[in-house]
Amino acid sequence: MKIKILVPIYNDWQSASNLLNDIDNNILDLDHELSVIIVNDASTHDRQEEQKDFKNIHSIKILNMKINQGHARCIATALKYIFEKEEFDYVIPMDGDGEDRPEEIKEFILFKLICDFKRYKNNTPKNK
């Protein structure tokens, strides 16, 4: 099973680094391919290049927004990117500031807590 965790970030790279460490430490016994996609919301603070080998995170990608769009737009952009460019079974959005708890990732996967939605490209139907 392929799981993508998407994390919007604006300037707080230290919290993002802490979150990645927490995610890596909390998915030890999961038998799934877990990747992280960070959405940089046009941060004004430089990101410290930190080369770290994570034992359990399969890959980390950074999507860079050209201008600051806000939290919701970052999530929407990442979801569009994941849908169009990545193979996945589940997507878990997490805040980069540590508000969301990485130890709950297992619960989402084990209990398959999901949200399903339909997207209409042109007009929303009158009867849903």
Where are these regions (language model features)?
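Short beta-strand/turn micro-motifs composed of small residues
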Residues: 7-9, 40
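Short, well-formed alpha-helical segments that are part of the catalytic scaffolds
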Residues: 12-27, 46
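Short helix-capping segments at alpha-helix termini
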Residues: 27-32, 54-59, 87
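A conserved acidic beta->alpha catalytic loop
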Residues: 40-49, 98
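Acceptor/aglycone-binding surface of glycosyltransferases and processive sugar-polymer synthases
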Residues: 65-82, 88-90, 99-128
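Cell-envelope/extracellular polymer assembly enzymes that use nucleotide-activated donors
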Residues: 2-4, 35
